[in-house]
A protein has these predicted regions:
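Hydrophobic membrane-insertion alpha-helices, especially the h-region
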Residues: 7-21
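Extracytoplasmic segments of membrane-associated envelope/inner-membrane machinery
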Residues: 105-181
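Short, glycine-/polar-rich solvent-exposed loops and beta-turns at beta-strand/coil boundaries
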Residues: 94-100, 179, 223-224, 232
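Aromatic-capped interface at the extracytoplasmic side
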Residues: 19-39
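Conserved small/polar residues in nucleotide/adenosyl-binding loops
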Residues: 243-249
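Flexible glycine-/small-residue-rich
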Residues: 41-43, 104-110, 136, 146, ...
Length: 251
């Protein structure tokens, strides 16, 4: 008797399982409800301009959160368009996952220079040569000061920023770029008490190669604080100005 009851219960469980399995199999993916989002923010370790909370807050604020909606009713293209309007986002990809979730991959804009001009302008130049607003967190890039207009920044200074990003030695060494009224460039290094005068923008490969040679064969021998100014303005030569020392007066 007990054996028959157990067999009956087993058959009932098998029947219930088959009913659930068939129902789930026949349910169209479009009718399934979105269970959540999988957010991926690229370069989040180096640049924390955008957070997952910020993305969620933006979607909820525009009533675009896909969670709880039918997968077939979710417009991933609309999500991409809305998120791409954020001034700190470079690219967005939205897609459906097999687990009934919406995947969102965000690429942040990458700043290469910060401009703090005499005219009051304060912004970043990104790696595409476009003006970028100041986010809540700061980026460790060279600061540009002086007589800087936006046209000069995105054309002339952008190429210098790209050069610095491509050369880790100079990216680490150059702390500030000052633009004079004559649109000539002065660099303030992190190491050393000198000013590096580049002159007019351009010829960065040649100028910095000269500076590297001077560092290795000159400053390493005489000391990093011997000169107050190192000029790379002219081809095939470097001119320097000595640091003026104040001598103690005799009693």
């Amino acid at each position: 008797m007990i054996k028959k009851i157990l067999i009956l219960l087993f058959l009932l469980l098998i029947t219930a399982y088959l009913i659930v399995a068939v129902t789930a199999f026949n349910t169209k993916p479009a009718d399934q409800v979105c269970k959540g989002m999988e957010l991926i923010i690229k370069d989040s370790i180096d640049h924390g301009f955008i957070s997952q909370k910020g993305i969620l807050r933006l979607l909820n604020g525009k009533k675009l959160s896909p969670v709880g909606k039918k997968m077939g009713d979710i417009n991933t293209r609309l999500l991409e368009e809305e998120l791409s309007q954020h001034p700190l986002i470079e690219n967005v990809e939205c897609y459906r996952t097999p687990g009934c979730k919406i995947g969102i991959e965000v690429t942040q804009r990458l700043p290469i220079l910060r401009v703090m001009a005499n005219n009051g302008d304060n912004y970043y130049i990104d790696n595409k040569g476009k003006i970028m607003p100041i986010p809540n967190s700061s980026a460790h890039v060279a600061v540009v000061t002086g007589y800087v207009d936006r046209d000069f920044a995105v054309k002339e200074l952008y190429t210098l920023g790209v050069f610095l990003q491509a050369h880790p030695l100079w990216d680490a060494q150059i702390e500030q770029i000052n633009v004079t009224q004559a649109k000539e460039l002065e660099l303030v290094p992190r190491v050393g008490e000198h000013i590096i005068f580049l002159g007019k923008p351009g010829n960065y490969e040649e100028k910095f190669e000269k500076l590297k040679t001077f560092y290795e064969k000159g400053l390493n021998q005489v000391g990093w604080n011997k000169y107050s100014r190192i000029s790379l303005e002219f081809n095939n030569q470097i001119t320097v100005s000595y640091t003026h020392l104040t001598l103690p007066t005799t009693p």
